Regions:
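Solvent-exposed, polar/charged alpha-helical surfaces in well-ordered, non-transmembrane soluble domains
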Residues: 64-75, 95, 99-106, 126, ...
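Classic N-terminal secretory signal peptides
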Residues: 12-15
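A short alpha-helix/helix-coil micro-patch that ends at or immediately precedes a cysteine
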Residues: 45-110
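Disulfide-stabilized extracellular recognition modules
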Residues: 25-34, 38-40, 135, 140-199
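Bacterial N-terminal signal peptides that target proteins for export
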Residues: 1-10
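Short, surface-exposed glycine/acidic/tryptophan-bearing loops
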Residues: 94-147, 166
Length: 199
């Protein structure tokens, strides 16, 4: 069965661009137009062998702070557009997701282009496969223009599709990264990958 990637259009939030992707194989769209459920037994051919093992503690104070902020949002529950999300379990930091997010953030900054498609035509599942992350559910948020991670996370929480990704109980791991683009009107590009490892 072929892979289906559901995309939402870029949203303008507070004058800054955001874009969200739904998980790779949604069961059906929810009220905000995306689904955040595991792919339900469908085989993805580009999936790398092996299962990524999350790191229990991010390597730096900045990434620990990022993880704490994400998990604070999840613990509080949220209304994403018209959909209410109950509090969700915390996610663990995953170095492979972070690496895939970092490479994509750098690629967007180098091109000065906010996109879920890499300069080589890759999508989020291609990028995590390159980092040997085998997944059962996967989602991606990208943003441009936010100078701090706290502002980027707050922006994603104001956008229904991004918020739904961050609040999804289907995701157990996360990696977030940023890259600067000096001289660009946005200045910073960020990528967040949320996933659950393959069983």
């Amino acid at each position: 069965m072929s892979q289906s990637l559901v995309r939402t259009t870029a949203a303008l939030v507070g004058g800054l661009c955001l874009a969200a992707c739904a998980p790779v194989q949604p069961a059906r769209p929810n009220a905000v137009g995306i689904a955040v459920e595991p792919r339900g037994g469908l085989v993805l051919h580009e999936r790398a062998p092996g299962t990524a093992s999350p790191t229990s503690l991010p390597p730096s104070a900045e990434t620990r702070d990022t993880l704490q902020r994400i998990n604070s949002y999840r613990a509080a529950g949220a209304t994403c557009g018209t959909q209410r999300f109950a509090p969700a379990a915390p996610v663990a930091w995953n170095a492979r997701l972070e690496q895939a997010a970092q490479k994509h953030a750098r690629d967007m900054a180098a091109r000065r282009a906010l996109s879920h498609t890499g300069s080589d035509g890759s999508n989020m599942s291609d990028r995590v496969a390159r980092e040997a992350y085998a997944f059962s559910a996967l989602g991606e948020n990208v943003s441009a223009g936010y100078t701090s991670v706290s502002d980027a996370l707050a922006g994603w929480m104001r956008s229904p599709g991004h918020c739904a990704n961050m609040m999804s109980k289907s995701f157990r791991e996360v990696g977030v990264a940023a890259a600067s683009a000096p001289g660009d009107s946005f200045g910073w590009y960020r990528a967040m990958l949320l996933g659950s490892p393959a069983r």
